[in-house]
Amino acid sequence: MKYTVSFEEIVWFDSSCQNDREMASYTQGCLILVGILVTLSLPYSHAFWGNENKIQTAVFLSPKFVLGPGSVENRFYYNVNFPKGHIAVRSFDAEVIDEAGNPIPLHETYLHHWVVVRYYVRKGVEISEFDDPRKFNESDYISGRNSGICQNLGQFFGLGSETRKTSTHVPNPYGIEVGNPTEIPSGFEEQWMLNVHAIDTRGAEDKLGCTECRCDLYNITVDEYGRPLRPDYRGGLLCCYDHTQCKVKHGFEAVRRTLYLRYTVKWVDMDRSVLPVKIYIFDITDGWKRSRCSTGIIAEHECKVEYDIESCDATGIGNDGCIDTRRISLDMPFGGYLIYGVAHQHSGGTGSALYREDGQLMCSSLPTYGEGEEPGNEAGYIVGMTTCYPKPGTVEISKGETLILESNYSRIRHHTGVMGLFYILVADELPKSMHALHTVVQTQDSIMVVTTLWAAVALIGVVAVIVVAAHYRLKREGEDGYEAIGM
């Protein structure tokens, strides 16, 4: 938005104020109006907010992976493409596509999850896309994880089947800061790892069972390292690791196809106008317990990531209100302002929420289920999770405060390997000018920032200028007319 006034108009008003003795009483007002006009002739970004920080966009492809009916891809790709420099990420979106760039529906290739993790590698040490992290020399590799709180959930970005219809937008003036030279260890460089876990369910005997990684459908009794599974482990990540095979219908055939994860990153250059946010991930399976010596730090949190849901029939409970509700209490080892929140759930999920200890709702996230066949609307699958964007400054987390995480699932049928994660962004500070310059209008999935104060000033200024000019001209014309008659 830019209000432009010509130099001639400014001079005309200034000379009018100075040259007409009959307008002496208006001189002060005219000078004020001249000031308003000069101010309004500047772009608002320069007049009030500083230099505009342009949003940049890049689209990347993961290394290709090839899937046939029932097969599984769960690879870790190192040193993947990512924007360079000291930047603030504003969004990170992804989806599975084929070689022609066509989106692949979940009922053909189920995207269990994708995650992006930062790490630092010693300069001169080559890490290929397909390296095994267990072979890394510890002195050459340093984790660049998020701020907490689970030891094994260090990703910066990540979603699952809900990826196409879940907002990852970080509202202005915030951003996820990466590439900060002062944070990169001396002699190291920042790189990124991408993990893609996808399951081809074409022709599967039980599509949902394959996506929930039921061990009987994969005929798995040991994990990917050859260790025997627990007798009570019926399904989850330990049964659908890379190159496993889910059971397909007898005689079903389909071509193997090459796929990619296409990911789109939006960012701005990091400068003083951007306020960095920190990433925290909570897990409903977290085994943390309060004790005299507990501090809530990462080392104290044992997050199992997945759990099972027993059906109502198995527990003798009717279908009415047949919901599995789990709650845990967590003491916050940090403080700040909640900027964004979203949950991650699997099929059967009915929503998740974050509460204060007194029961006050801080943020909720609900699943959207598809109703059709096309990508982004696949019936029976979670195709999106609602997000929360609290009005800046309204939801503050105090260090040491106890929060309650809740995760809900339907128990109409048995589920294995479900998740109950909650991802939040927290800022240490608020923009100093936000309350004076903006009115924040919240919707469930996005925030529309409406610049009102200076627009109102601009409108008032323009109207005032027009009124004064019209009044002066009418008065002058009237006086000229009386003089002519008098002569």
What does each of the following model-derived ranges do?
Residues E477-M487:
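Cytoplasmic C-terminal tails of single-pass
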Residues W12-Q18, L40, F60, S273:
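Compositionally biased, intrinsically disordered/low-complexity regions enriched for serine, proline
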Residues L453-A469:
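Single-pass alpha-helical transmembrane segments
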Residues H46-T451, A470-L474:
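Beta-strand-centric surfaces of beta-sandwich/beta-rich domains
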Residues M1-V34:
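Classical eukaryotic N-terminal signal peptides for Sec-dependent ER targeting/secretion
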Residues T27-Y44, G461-A464:
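Cleavable N-terminal signal peptides of Sec/SRP-targeted secreted and luminal proteins
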Residues S6, W12-D14, G35, T39, ...:
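N-terminal non-cleavable signal-anchor helices
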